[in-house]
Amino acid sequence: MDDRIAVHGRGDCGLDDEFVCFDIETTGLKVDREAITEIGAVVLKNGEICERFQTFVNPNRRLTPEIIGLTGITDEMLKDAPQLKDALTDFLKFVNGRPLAAHNAEFDIGFIRAGCKKVGLDFNPTYV
């Protein structure tokens, strides 16, 4: 039996309400050494997409050939992208306090949480 917690944060949200499904791309797997390169999200309500969000994030470093091959994101795509604080500020405005859902949420939430801490933004989401 898997007894891990499925919902983190406030427990009074239902899946009939609006929630945000999101995904990130990064320069690697280690939250303490790597950086976010893209954030994508949609708002779902009653199973329908209501809003969309996408931004690249400038990691201020070159990508490895492995990451380029895995994500399809190139250095050229990131050179004029927003810096982390601006990208996260825009993402948090888009989320607007709604619950978050992600495949492998611990990974994605970990990077968003670390990024917010690094740039001084509050981030205490409800997520599944």
Put a short name on every predicted segment.
Residues M1-Y127:
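Conserved non-catalytic scaffold segment of RNase H-like nuclease domains
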